[in-house]
Amino acid sequence: EPIEEDRFVGGDIYEVVQSPYGTRVIIGDVQGKGLPAIGAGFAAIAAFREAAVREPTLTGVVEALEDAVVRHNVFSAQTGEAERFVTALILGFDEGGDVQAVNCGHLPPRLLHEGRASAVPLDRTSVPLGLAGLSRESRAEESFALPPEATLLVVTDGVTEARDAARDFYPFDQRLGDWAGHGPRELLDALHVDLEKFTGGVRRDDVAALALRRAPGDGRPRPTAAAEEARPVAGAVSD
């Protein structure tokens, strides 16, 4: 139930796709701002929408994303624009209780379950999209459990790097501990209100947040998203 239909928010991107291989999700952050960043974001989103339903493996989806960002950068260089990279977390949900993940330099997801909140330990974090040529290691898929009634929260660094008037960082994980019993929509609403209060309404980066919970019975995740450009909405904000 996305609150905002636009899946590209300033420098942040997110999308949820139902595929023959299960539900696939991306959340990401494009380096930089302005029209060049928007172009790289659109390239990544378009590639994800196609590859998510075509590629049987999550690493295949990520390879398609890498190719798309690299092609975009080649075109950008020819037109005198700076090259861009994209941090991204790509998730796959099947009929079982596990989640597959490929982390391309993005923040790890947070798991809220049974009154506790914790970061999901992902050990194979790789370089951002567009930079695979600089790494000797290939990207690898990991998996972790998503128990029934648990909520998985993924955000961009506009949340974790938000600052107050004293230049202190937003205490993201501390707040999640206070909200560990919330459902997806209630969680995003609380995050939005608290970010507004903490920053005094002054933010210097885009913000996107996506809360996912498996729908009862079919094993598929039910996403709740919040993201908007320039002004706040219930759940998350973006500047």
Predicted regions and their residues:
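Sensory beta-sandwich core in regulatory modules of signaling proteins
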Residues: 25, 153, 209-210
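DG-centered beta-turn motif at the end of beta-strands
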Residues: 29, 106, 155-158, 206
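Catalytic core of PPM/PP2C metal-dependent serine/threonine phosphatase domains
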Residues: 39-116, 121, 127, 138-139, ...
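Active-site-proximal, acidic helix/loop segment immediately C-terminal to a metal-coordinating Asp/Glu
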Residues: 37-51, 125, 143-202, 218-235
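Short, surface-exposed charged micro-motifs
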Residues: 13-15, 90, 143
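Short alpha-helical "switch" segments that flank and position catalytic residues
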Residues: 21-28, 35-44
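PP2C/PPM family metal-dependent serine/threonine protein phosphatase catalytic domain
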Residues: 1-7, 107-144, 169, 230-239
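N-terminal entry segment of metal-dependent catalytic domains or homologous docking segments
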Residues: 1-27
